[in-house]
Every structure is written in C-alpha cells, then in structure tokens.
C-alpha cells in the first residue's frame, strides 16, 4: 500500500493481533502492538512519525478494558481496502478505531482511548 501506512494495536488479543498482522503484511501495512507501559506516549511517537520523541514517562494505569486500533499514514482508499479485507478475513471486530489526524497526533494513547470510549458509549445508547 504505502511505506507510511501503519496500524497501532492496543490491548488486542494475541490470536486476533496475529490475524491482523498477517492481513497487514499482505497489504504492505506496518503494525505495532503497543505495550501497556507506552500508553502515556504521544500517538505521533507511537506511529513512528518524524519529530516525535519518546517522553520520559511510563504509564502506570490499568490496561484498557477494550481493544483499540489506530490508523496512521493511510488515505481513505487504503483504509477502505483494509477494512474490506478485514471483513473478508472474518477477523472479529474492534470497537474502538481512530485515524491519526493533525489534531490527535499530539494526544497520549490513554487520552484517545478515553475519548473513543466515551463516543462508543454514546453510540451504543442510540
């Protein structure tokens, strides 16, 4: 797909993560399983974006209760292709998904999780 296409996986069950990684290899997308200790890092750093450095902080909170997937460096066609192939592969869905943007690139993973979880709860009640 593209050299910059990258998907970050947070608290994704190992078997499912392996399925996603296999799909991504076929599509030319890099993947990273983000460790709990890195949840306090900025998304730009976790996605390997130039100009972001690891901060001297370590996450001390609990594991996220839900899985989260963050897309970086993927245009809408790439994202659509990935999601279509994801469904075809019968990989169980991940409820919390986000695209890295100029706005949220400076957020910490834990902040994005909280925001997505709130939004997900609102949509579940609708």
Stretch-by-stretch model annotation:
Residues 10, 68, 72-73, 98-102:
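Short, charged/polar micro-motifs that form catalytic or ligand-binding hotspots
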Residues 47-54, 72-78, 108-117:
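Noncatalytic linker/hinge segments flanking ATPase motor cores
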Residues 22-31, 51-62, 96-103:
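Charged, low-complexity, helix/coiled-coil-prone segments
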Residues 58-89:
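Mid-chain, well-packed structural core segment of small domains
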Residues 6-7, 18-19, 32, 79-125:
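Helix-rich interaction surfaces within compact, conserved domain-sized segments
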Residues 39-68:
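Short, intrinsically disordered low-complexity segments
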Residues 1-50:
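N-terminal, charge-rich interaction modules
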């Amino acid at each position: 797909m593209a050299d910059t296409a990258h998907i970050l996986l947070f608290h994704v069950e190992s078997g499912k993560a392996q399925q996603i990684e296999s799909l991504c290899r076929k599509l030319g997308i890099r993947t990273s399983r983000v460790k709990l200790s890195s949840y306090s890092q900025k998304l730009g750093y976790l996605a390997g974006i130039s100009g972001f450095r690891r901060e001297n902080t370590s996450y001390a909170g609990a594991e996220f209760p839900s899985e989260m997937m963050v897309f970086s460096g993927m245009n809408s066609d790439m994202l659509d292709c990935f999601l279509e192939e994801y469904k075809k592969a019968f990989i169980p869905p991940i409820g919390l998904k986000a695209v890295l943007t100029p706005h949220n690139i400076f957020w910490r993973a834990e902040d994005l999780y909280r925001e997505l979880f709130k939004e997900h709860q609102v949509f579940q009640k609708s």
